Amino acid sequence: MRRAGLGDGAPPGSYGNYGYANTGYNACEEENDRLTESLRSKVTAIKSLSIEIGHEVKNQNKLLAEMDSQFDSTTGFLGKTMGRLKILSRGSQTKLLCYMMLFSLFVFFVIYWIIKLR
């Protein structure tokens, strides 16, 4: 099966446009060029958006890694503190623990009172 306008069946004087009328062929080419340019601009926009998303993901991953290390160090610090408090509560130093709690309550009360007066 042969397509019209290809090979030997092309009408005389229509070389290069495959048998289409010049106006119809040019209109199709212009529409194709316009659609191609539109598609190119959309692909460029999507590409730049995906690159920006990639940069944002890298930054967020870096922040998450920093937060993870900070949480790990805080967890270790709190674990050591709780261990010391357990040792303190087990020993015969219950008076010292009671004094420390009373002093802490006093300090918080003073801070609360100072903030409230402002």
UniProtKB/Swiss-Prot annotation:
Phylogenetic placement of the source organism: Eukaryota, Metazoa, Chordata, Craniata, Vertebrata
Intervals, Vesicular compartment: 116-118
Any single biological process term in GO: endoplasmic reticulum to Golgi vesicle-mediated transport
Gene giving rise to this polypeptide: Bet1
Subunit structure, interactors included: Interacts with SNARE complex members GOSR2, SEC22B and STX5. Interacts with LMAN1/ERGIC53. Interacts with STX17.
Chain positions with Phosphoserine modification: 50
The protein's role, per its UniProt record: Required for vesicular transport from the ER to the Golgi complex. Functions as a SNARE involved in the docking process of ER-derived vesicles with the cis-Golgi membrane.
CDD domains (UniProt xref): SNARE_Bet1
Membrane topology: Single-pass type IV membrane protein
GO cellular component, one term: cis-Golgi network
InterPro entries, A to Z: BET1_SNARE, T_SNARE_dom
Cytoplasmic topological segments: 1-94
Protein name from the UniProt record: BET1 homolog
Membrane-traversing stretches: 95-115
t-SNARE coiled-coil homology domain segment(s): 26-88
Record localization: Endoplasmic reticulum membrane; Golgi apparatus, cis-Golgi network membrane; Golgi apparatus membrane
Family: Belongs to the BET1 family.
UniProt entry keywords in alphabetical sequence: Coiled coil, Endoplasmic reticulum, ER-Golgi transport, Golgi apparatus, Membrane, Phosphoprotein, Protein transport, Transmembrane, Transmembrane helix, Transport
